[in-house]
């Protein structure tokens, strides 16, 4: 909660406290932030049995012993599920994600890598959190961002999966400040979605920054295109002075795009996310994993998923993980293997 009066002031249009699922604006449709302190893994890369017994396995969203299993029943994470009509960006700052999909792609990424999945049409994948450390703990810090696709790009057959390795990511660093440029431009650094079907390109002024500030560190970004929706998230830390106002962490701020965002951090290390982009501005219908143009299209898509979800899945299990010693890689269905640069 900020130290504001009842109404936000100055460049702040709206403020709200944050939860695991963040408030978003067009073109962003959903953001989830998962932080879990998993224990050492067993031979299955799963938590010890005594720490998962008694849970509502398959839908465990309550932290017990410091972690959640989510939809996983053995390994934490999200077994086979559909995406339809949007693009997903996943950044595990700590921890690993094992990814397998309906097209036969599989891989492991983590510790600063960024995965882009564009799913204009019916697409299925699983995202599991393997506990690869069998002696120490396996903490996870995973942020997932979903960006809508415009109506003209929905229901196209070409989905895509790409991993941008941590070693290839653009960073901007000054004393006390480290900015990871996930999408867009910042101080001469730039990167855009590698997907064919995307809204996250230069022409739509999409920018996604992850900002780490040391105690007393400073960050600044100038005014944006007046058309964009601009949102700042104070994810961890204690206090900071943002555009002249003192706020405390766990705060979402919708900000006037014409303002310069300047942050002076307090006495603890802090993490902020900045999400901005030109809104698509089209009426859409969403239910569960589907974002299409009309309610009827969504109903038809749900029926397709019910009839086809297991027929399209090429793997033996719906919660697939890779071997414990796999390292970070992306193995495409055509046999092409991609790994981080040496």
Residue ranges of model-derived segments:
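Jelly-roll (double-stranded beta-helix
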Residues: 1-342
